[in-house]
């Protein structure tokens, strides 16, 4: 009788412990580096445990500027993890970009610091013995010069799909990608930060209820390009098991800086650090304050259209380099050789990638006065390095896209100009990458997202999906802002389900959703909108045109799809 009473008390205590784990307002987890105390929130009746500002590296300050990240210092006692960490130092429009992607009812203003190697974790509350959950690690976009983990809210996706979400951030711009193309500054610091975060996930995510053996990378724009690049990096092998690239791959022209020493010398010149010795140059830049480095960054005028400058001298961004270690070779060469991670890959584009956000940031004049064929030709001339075309090919592009357009139809001219940029960059790079992964025998799923979100209030309404619009639906924006209609909520649920299914199994289908065909030789893809449809051969004729241009430039690297 006595042992029955003891056992009953034990079971009662276990149940109370489990219940406490589910409902405590100040959840704690023990990581490899120390104990964290987070906070609990609810999505409907589902409790979500949130841990903010979790260090995955030592602060990249002093001698660690322009150096690989190092593991974080362990701490004693309980570390508070209830405050959003500062984003990495970045361009001033990073705050605007953060407002654009935010799905919170009230916007959280970002802070910025060079001490920024932190991540945020959103995990469904669990009872002891519950099975481990799939892990999804988000890579922010921002042209490698803006972006922050705290711009994103993960509670809806984590709660509705029972996944553990990790939002990372990494060094940006000069801090993240300065390279002298030698041992004094090899570059790719931002990519190394990403891999340090992924190693932290492998070591610690089980404490949050996540499965380190089921990690999916997903990201947008520059984040999507980074993921595509990590799929070609031997240093990232074993750190993830599936990958999703939204509006960007490593074949995007912006991903690789082809002459990093030239860029480093320009940075040094603007900073007053000119020197023939790259060692002295780097040490001089390392000694500057973060504020001074950002003043130099502002003078570089990244991502700015400039009609007065020689297009060959325009530096669009600071970005990764082929260093032989992190990125062993040109991404196109690696893809051609099939040197990619053997993991399922889901990727896609939006149908109006160059509609408002990017033209606004890049100061593209798309107003009525500027929309003339002569002005568009000048724009193409100025952006030809971004579009990856030669000056001799500019007239061919004008003929292909503008030949049958009335000179006075400024709206059609604007639409064609937007088509040129998105086709030459996002669409071409995405489709080519999909083909190479498919031909390597890997599962590939392709999409085109087509719906503009009513809840994105910082830009004008359009009839299609601008760059980044899909994130509003992926992170449950229609449920958070109160500005969406029922159909948008249904689309959001559908997207969350597709993405989470892919994270669970490597296949977005589950029998309850419209079938998403695998991307094979028939080139079928999913058109995501209120009515989901299957398309075939996305922009086939235009892609054939761009293929012919690029083949004529470097036939030794290109091949037909």
Swiss-Prot record:
Recorded family membership: Belongs to the type-B carboxylesterase/lipase family.
One GO MF term attached to the UniProt entry: carboxylic ester hydrolase activity
Domain of life: Eukaryota
Disulphide-bridged cysteine pairs: 88-116, 273-284
Chain's role: Probable carboxylesterase.
Entry EC number(s): 3.1.1.-
Enzyme kind, highest EC tier: hydrolase
Gene label: CES4A
Subcellular location: Secreted
Pfam families xref list: COesterase
GO cellular component, one term: extracellular region
Active site residues of this protein: 221, 353, 467
UniProt name for this protein: Carboxylesterase 4A
InterPro entries given in the database record: AB_hydrolase_fold, CarbesteraseB, Carboxylesterase_B_AS, Carboxylesterase_B_CS, Type-B_Carboxylest/Lipase
Residues that carry a glycan: 214, 276, 388
Hydrolase is among the record's keywords: yes
Signal peptide as annotated in the record: 1-20
Sorted UniProt keywords: Disulfide bond, Glycoprotein, Hydrolase, Secreted, Serine esterase, Signal
């Amino acid at each position: 009788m006595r042992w029955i009473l003891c056992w009953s008390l034990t079971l009662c205590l276990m149940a109370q412990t489990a219940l406490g784990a589910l409902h405590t307002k100040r959840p704690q987890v023990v990581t490899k580096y120390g104990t964290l105390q987070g906070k609990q929130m609810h999505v409907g009746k589902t409790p979500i445990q949130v841990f903010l500002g979790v260090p995955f590296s030592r602060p990249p300050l002093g001698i660690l500027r322009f150096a690989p990240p190092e593991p974080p210092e362990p701490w004693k006692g309980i570390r508070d993890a209830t405050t959003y960490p500062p984003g990495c130092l970045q361009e001033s429009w990073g705050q605007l970009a953060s407002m654009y992607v935010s799905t919170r009812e009230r916007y959280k203003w970002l802070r910025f610091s060079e001490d920024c190697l932190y991540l945020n974790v959103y995990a469904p509350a669990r009872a002891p013995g519950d099975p481990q959950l799939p892990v999804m690690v988000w890579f922010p976009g921002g042209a490698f010069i803006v972006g922050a983990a705290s711009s994103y809210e993960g509670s809806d996706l984590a709660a509705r799909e029972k996944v553990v979400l990790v939002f990372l951030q990494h060094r940006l711009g000069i801090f993240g990608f300065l390279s002298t193309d030698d041992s004094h500054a090899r570059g790719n610091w931002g990519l190394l930060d990403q891999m340090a975060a992924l190693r932290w996930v492998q070591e610690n995510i089980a404490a949050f209820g996540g499965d380190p053996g089921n990690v999916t990378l997903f990201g947008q724009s520059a984040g999507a390009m980074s993921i595509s690049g990590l799929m070609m990096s031997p240093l990232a092998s074993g750190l993830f098991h599936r990958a999703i690239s939204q509006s960007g791959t490593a074949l995007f022209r912006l991903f690789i800086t082809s002459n990093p020493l030239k860029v480093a010398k320009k940075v040094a010149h603007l900073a007053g650090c000119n020197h023939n010795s790259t060692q002295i140059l780097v040490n001089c830049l390392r000694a500057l304050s973060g504020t001074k480095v950002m003043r130099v960054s502002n003078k570089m005028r990244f991502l700015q259209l400039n009609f007065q400058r020689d297009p060959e001298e325009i530096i669009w961004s600071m970005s990764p380099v082929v260093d032989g270690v992190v990125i062993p070779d040109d991404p196109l060469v690696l893809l051609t050789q099939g040197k990619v991670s053997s993991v399922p890959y889901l990727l896609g584009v939006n149908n109006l990638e160059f509609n408002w956000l990017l033209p606004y940031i890049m100061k593209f004049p798309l107003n009525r006065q500027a929309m003339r064929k002569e002005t568009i030709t000048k724009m193409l001339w100025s952006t030809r390095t971004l579009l990856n075309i030669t000056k001799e090919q500019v007239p061919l592009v004008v003929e292909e896209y503008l030949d049958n357009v009335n000179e006075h139809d400024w709206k059609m001219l604007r639409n064609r100009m937007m088509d040129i940029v998105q086709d030459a960059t996002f669409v071409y790079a995405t489709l080519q990458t999909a083909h190479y992964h498919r031909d390597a025998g890997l599962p590939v799923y392709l999409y085109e997202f087509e719906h503009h979100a009513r809840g994105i209030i910082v830009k004008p309404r359009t009839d299609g999906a601008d760059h980044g619009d899909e994130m509003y639906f992926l992170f449950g924006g229609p449920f958070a802002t109160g500005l969406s209609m029922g159909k948008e909520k249904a689309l959001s649920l559908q997207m969350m389900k597709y993405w989470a299914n892919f994270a669970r199994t490597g296949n977005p289908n589950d029998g309850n959703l419209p079938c998403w065909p695998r991307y094979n030789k028939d080139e079928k893809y999913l058109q995501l909108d209120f009515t989901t449809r299957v398309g075939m051969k996305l922009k086939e004729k235009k892609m054939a045109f761009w293929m012919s241009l690029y083949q004529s430039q470097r036939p030794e690297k290109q091949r037909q799809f």
